């Protein structure tokens, strides 16, 4: 048993040593080689030692030299190949001339003369001279033309002279068209117009004052419809408000809802809706907490527009509200709505 433990201990030590050796070897293998160990190190050293005849290496860097004060550097003069660029290359074919070759070589080159300074002369066209003078004269130079006064162009005389020179009729030049003289606008008497306007305004104001003023007529009758919650139930404000808005009711005067002639909530009031419980008002900001036993719709007679049409709208609105809230429609006496009640309301409408 002890021999087995010793063998295992030796094998384990050998395995650990092998792993360590392999690790060091792999780490050393992965490290980059330095320039000294690179196979190209000798080549770079030889290239650095090589220099040309002037003492410069492959990169154009010379040796470091120390100069003494007063020492003059010797300049190296390189031979330069000079060529005569003025000579033209000889062509492949040569021309035979009567003069011998030596004479042609002895002849001096063409003498270069400086160009003479020529004064520019300004020459006027011949056609222009026909319009200016009677006879055709030579064009003056620039110096004389600056001093001589210019003649004014006369279309009548120049046209006749042009016909005499050319022998052909020349079309007459169109004369400039003068704009028609507009008659002066008559002066407007502003004061008179202002007085006339004032007089018209005064007449209209007097007519309005004489016209009878439509005083508000006192109502002679009121048509009432009740919407009452069923037994054991209440009308919730959160359900009532959307129904009223869908029927174009608008919250307004006396803190109640009104139905106007315009669906946008403007114009005359056709009928109104109030709370059945006192004080009969609504709070639109707290409609979610609002509860009531019922609401009442009422329309005064006489009213604006056709009373029969207005009552029809009110009756249809009452039917819709009762259907939306699951409530009952009652008449003014809080009795169920019936055909007899409807006939009675129509009679009251006709009497109004």
Swiss-Prot record:
Residues 78-120, 138-160 are annotated as: Disordered. Residues 111-120 have a biased composition (Basic and acidic residues). Pfam families: ZipA_C. Residues 28-352 are cytoplasmic. Keywords: Cell cycle, Cell division, Cell inner membrane, Cell membrane, Membrane, Transmembrane, Transmembrane helix. It is a single-pass type I membrane protein. Residues 83-105, 141-160 have a biased composition (Polar residues). GO terms for biological process: division septum assembly; FtsZ-dependent cytokinesis. The keyword Transport does not apply. Gene3D superfamilies: ZipA, C-terminal FtsZ-binding domain. SUPFAM superfamilies: Cell-division protein ZipA, C-terminal domain (SSF64383). Signal peptide: none annotated. SMART domains: ZipA_C. GO terms for cellular component: cell division site; plasma membrane. Residues 1-6 are periplasmic. The chain crosses the membrane at residues 7-27. Essential cell division protein that stabilizes the FtsZ protofilaments by cross-linking them and that serves as a cytoplasmic membrane anchor for the Z ring. Also required for the recruitment to the septal ring of downstream cell division proteins. Belongs to the ZipA family. HAMAP family: ZipA. Interacts with FtsZ via their C-terminal domains. This is Cell division protein ZipA. It comes from Shewanella frigidimarina (strain NCIMB 400). The gene is zipA.
């Amino acid at each position: 048993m002890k021999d087995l433990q010793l063998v295992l201990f030796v094998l384990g030590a050998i395995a650990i040593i092998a792993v360590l050796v392999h690790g060091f070897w792999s780490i050393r293998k992965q490290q980059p080689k330095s320039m000294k160990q690179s196979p190209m190190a000798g080549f770079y050293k030889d290239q650095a030692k090589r220099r040309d005849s002037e003492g410069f290496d492959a990169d154009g860097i010379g040796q470091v030299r120390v100069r003494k004060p007063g020492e003059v550097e010797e300049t190296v003069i390189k031979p330069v190949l000079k060529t005569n660029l003025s000579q033209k290359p000889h062509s492949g074919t040569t021309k035979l001339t009567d003069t011998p070759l030596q004479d042609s070589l002895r002849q001096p080159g063409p003498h270069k003369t400086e160009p003479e300074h020529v004064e520019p002369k300004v020459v006027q066209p011949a056609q222009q001279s026909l319009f200016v003078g009677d006879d055709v004269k030579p064009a003056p130079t620039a110096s004389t033309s600056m001093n001589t006064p210019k003649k004014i162009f006369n279309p009548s005389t120049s046209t006749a002279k042009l016909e005499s020179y050319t022998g052909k009729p020349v079309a007459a030049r169109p004369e400039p068209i003068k704009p028609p003289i507009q008659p002066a606008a008559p002066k407007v008497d502003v004061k008179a117009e202002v007085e006339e306007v004032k007089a018209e305004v005064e007449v209209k104001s007097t007519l309005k004052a004489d016209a009878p003023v439509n005083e508000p007529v006192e109502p002679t009758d009121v048509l009432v419809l009740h919407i009452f919650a069923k037994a054991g139930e209440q009308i919730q404000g959160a359900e009532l408000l959307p129904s009223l808005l869908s029927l174009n009711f608008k919250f307004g005067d006396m803190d109640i809802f009104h139905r106007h002639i315009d669906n946008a909530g403007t114009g005359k009031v056709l009928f109104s809706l109030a709370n059945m419980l006192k004080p009969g008002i609504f709070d639109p900001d707290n409609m979610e907490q609002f509860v009531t036993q019922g609401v009442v719709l009422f329309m005064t007679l006489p009213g604006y527009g056709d009373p029969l049409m207005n009552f029809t709208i009110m009756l249809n609105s009452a039917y819709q509200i009762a259907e939306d809230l699951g409530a009952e429609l009652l008449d003014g006496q809080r009795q169920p709505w019936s055909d007899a009640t409807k006939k009675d309301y129509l009679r009251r409408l006709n009497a109004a």
